[in-house]
A protein has these predicted regions:
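Conserved acyl-donor/pantetheine-binding loop and adjacent beta-alpha core of acyl/acetyltransferases
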Residues: 57-89, 121
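Conserved beta-hairpin
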Residues: 41-62
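Short amphipathic alpha-helix that is part of the acyltransferase structural core
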Residues: 1-36, 40
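Conserved acetyl-CoA pyrophosphate-binding loop and the N-cap/start of the following alpha-helix
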Residues: 96-109
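Short coil/loop residues immediately preceding or within conserved phosphate-binding loops
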Residues: 43, 82, 124-126
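Residue-level recognition of the GNAT/N-acetyltransferase active site
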Residues: 88, 93, 132
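Conserved active-site alpha-helix within GNAT-family acetyltransferase domains
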Residues: 114, 118-150
Length: 150
């Protein structure tokens, strides 16, 4: 098996066609929408690859949370809008599942969020996640992640 490359921003050169996470909507987003949304500056998708073939990805986007809808520990004492980064998608190809790649992608996302926060690149108070289903929600809950109200 070829070496796994660290996550980098998605480009035209990445091979997407064979990606299959088992979740059709996650496959479709990567293969048909991720690059266009990135070019429009709506989100940024980072991909892990083997020989340029995408084996996992995650997508980050800036959002604002309504403080009244946010969990108390986040919304208490905050103005009406709370700046946040949304981990909108995280998916691993079926052939790579069960090997820790999902965890590695989450750690990489957290590192990038920390860099944004620590260096003041953008005002971000919190990272929230959008779990696609109960299985994903359980995955995120193991890392004390807060489901997104957006």
């Amino acid at each position: 098996m070829s070496k796994l490359a660290a996550p980098l921003p998605l480009t035209d050169g990445h091979l997407l066609e064979d990606f299959d996470s088992g979740q059709p909507s996650l496959n479709e987003f990567l293969q048909q929408h991720a690059l266009a949304k990135q070019r429009a500056m709506l989100s940024r998708t980072y991909v892990a690859t083997r020989e340029n073939r995408v084996v996992g990805y995650y997508t980050l986007a800036f959002v604002t949370l309504n403080s009244a809808e946010a969990p108390r520990r986040i919304g208490r004492g905050m103005p009406d809008s709370i700046p946040a980064l949304l981990l909108a998608r995280l998916a691993v190809d079926r052939r790579e599942q069960g090997r820790g790649l999902g965890r590695s992608l989450l750690v990489d996302a957290l590192r990038r969020v920390w860099e944004v926060m620590a260096h003041g690149h953008a005002p971000v108070r919190v990272l929230v996640v959008d779990a696609i289903d109960e299985s994903a929600a359980r995955f995120y809950s193991r890392f004390d992640m807060t489901p997104s109200p957006v």
